[in-house]
């Protein structure tokens, strides 16, 4: 990527220059770059809108250049930085539709997607993803499912999650064609796929077919937590300025320059370093894991049931043949100095990036080799996802009057929140 920018510097360079000048800071934030726990350069770079640092709400300088670089890298019509993660992107996409629209989405959508529908007072129509019974794992929505649903009842938009937490990817292009044929926009929560444009060995994202999509750069690239980007597709009928205006409504008016700077840097790192060396490392790592007794890495043989491709940098390890469940494997790995992204009943999930030191992979192999053995085979049950009968809108359910009742008395009642059990944090050591 050509870094000879119109304004002659990047966000990190501008912030570094300002910190080196060490002016008397009579502006926000209150720590003034001085005595804060993390100290040093990081505190010095935490500034506000100043001469030379641009303004995220209406960028015309270095932020605009950064957004333009993302636009070009992702093949979008317009790209906008997000400092509230893909949650703020989903809120923006939902509200940009207007209010009271009909939206078709998968039952496995992220909770922030449900919040977005509630806040916009949209009518949600849920579809069940395909189920892979052999893996005990939910697959993805299919073009046929979407078409049948739109034939039954029109919708203003289809909201698709792809890739999912396991790195599985839906037929986004096929679903886009169906949605557009029935007059619906296609919105994609691609939070876990920010890195896809940087290697031909990663799933191809059909940017030309999608209307709006968001990516969580912080999940898989070298950016700070909460750093994300919202993209407007080249053929989206919606005015990008409308999208930006809505983005400004749901995002703080005091955006973190540390987050924006990390977004700028993350794109530079991805384009300069590339992913080829990492793809080679991951191929070798997956082979090493596959040679460990009782372990199996999800691969191309796990596709189908709506999944047409997968992100091989998302290493999903099935531990059931070892006679243990995912939680036992997770906790054992923690004790070996390895912390996974998450686990479920049968697997542990690891997010790998080019920033991983090679030594971590050796430590992982050692931890996996020393996983305990269970006394019996773990049998997989297909996930049960019930649609139920909708009796009110998401907004009425989530924002209406509520009361807390015992679980035994909840039959026939409407849930105000979604409750689930998921192991995504480091367990307390004994």
PLM features per residue range, with description:
Residues 7, 11-16, 37, 73-76, ...:
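Conserved PLP-enzyme active-site core in the AAT-like
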Residues 42-85, 108:
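Conserved N-terminal alpha-helix of the aminotransferase class I/II PLP-enzyme fold
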Residues 78-80, 337-341:
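A short linear hydrophobic-aromatic micro-motif
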Residues 277-336, 347-366, 370-372, 384-411:
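Conserved PLP-binding catalytic core of the aspartate aminotransferase-like
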Residues 409-422:
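Short acidic, Pro/Gly- and aromatic-enriched capping/linker segments at domain boundaries
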Residues 422-430:
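Residue-level detector of conserved catalytic or cofactor/ligand-binding positions
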